[in-house]
Amino acid sequence: MPEPIGKPGDVHDRGTGRVPGPAICGRRGPLVGVIDHGSGNLHSVCQALQKAGAHPKLVSETRMLSAVDAVVLPGVGALGTAMANLRRINGVQQVQELVQRGERPVLGICVGHQMFFEQGTERDETVDGLGCLPGTVVPMPTSRLPHMGWNTVHPPADTALFTGISGERFYFVHSCAVVTVSPCALAHVEGDAAALAHTGDDATDPETGTGTASPGAIGHTAAGPESAHAMTGRNGHPVRTTTTCHDGCTFVSAIECGRLCSTQFHPEKSGPAGIQLLRNWLAMV
């Protein structure tokens, strides 16, 4: 497990001892602060960042975020719990300001992705998010929950986050999502419903090898002539929306908005495609 930022020492790998930071052009890669708010797949995230060429450090005191080159906000479980944990470490305003200034790349993963939106609903209660992106997180309107396993993504043509990634699948584990940002947000998905069809969600966990494959579902596109770039985030940049279909439900699976990026899927569990996505994000440093 990586040591907290501000303490001497490099990232540690369970079972192998000390692991030196990767060398890029004769030096270590970007110093990435992984926010430890008590809800996140921290060990796997840090290992994946190392493979992508970064030097990850856990940050439990958000005032230390000024010392890093980029920031990851991970999260698992419930949105309300994750937001409460972030408030507990006085991180809400700091993360909002990071996104607003746009000086460092910021990446949200899974519930961390959901935290950047305006609000969410869970158990008939409304939870305020960080408000950096337009949209509401809701329980997905399908009986096949959780959405767990491998699935395809459909990014817009001009996204930097998916450069060099085509036709790959990513690993999802979630029951809530931003099903609709606005009618125009999903309009970039080209082609007819067949273009979004997939052969099935492989529910095998890439780390444990457990799980089963579930039947496939035919996707659908959202109607509307408007461009997804009609929306802007709090930082003033256009919102580039990537979508995924599960059991007939199209939802937002990734966002790129200036130097703010977020993914509903887990890049750290998504094999080579996930590592390439992290490299693309690190290129924004």
Can you annotate each of these PLM segments?
Residues G29-G33:
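Extreme N-terminal starter segment of soluble prokaryotic enzymes
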Residues H55, P105-L107, R169:
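Structural signature of beta-strand start/N-cap positions in the alpha/beta core
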Residues V68:
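An anion/phosphate-binding loop that grips the pyrophosphate of nucleotide cofactors and donors
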Residues I24, G135-V285:
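Amide-donor transfer/coupling interface in amidating biosynthetic enzymes
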Residues G77-W150:
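Cysteine-nucleophile active-site neighborhood
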Residues C46-A54:
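Two-component/phosphorelay signaling modules centered on CheY-like receiver
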